[in-house]
Amino acid sequence: MAKSLRSKWKRKMRAEKRKKNAPKELARLKTVLAKGSNVLMDDVKEIATVVPAKKINEKMDLDVDAPEGESSKMDTELKRNKKNLRDQHGQYPVWFNQRQQKKLKSQCGKKKGKSKQAKKLAW
């Protein structure tokens, strides 16, 4: 689709607005950083638990070192039929819409008959 004049104009105006407000935004960010370095984390500790970055990194390293089969494998009890994508209860996946189900059922239904031999060429 082509870009409309309205969208081009809006994009242009947003760019000009960003250019105009850039110095104010930079000053605001600097003040936030300056305040942040002096303030203790006591206020934040009441709201959420503060965990040092080292502990998180160590935990991530342990997960990476673990064998692939143990940590990354999901516990799925449902077994799907690869041919028709139904699970053991006859349900299709959530992402499989009605049209796709109908098409798949019709394709599976066609194949149930007796197979015929190919016609031979008459020379």
Curated annotation (Swiss-Prot):
GO terms for biological process: dendrite extension; positive regulation of dendritic spine development. Keywords: Chromosome, Nucleus. It is found in: Nucleus, Nucleolus; Chromosome. GO terms for cellular component: chromosome; nucleolus. Residues 1-21, 100-123 have a biased composition (Basic residues). The keyword Nucleus applies. Pfam families: LLPH. Residues 1-22, 61-123 are annotated as: Disordered. InterPro entries: LLPH-like. One of its GO terms (molecular function) is basal RNA polymerase II transcription machinery binding. Coiled coil: none annotated. Residues 70-89 have a biased composition (Basic and acidic residues). Belongs to the learning-associated protein family. Regulates dendritic and spine growth and synaptic transmission. This is Protein LLP homolog.
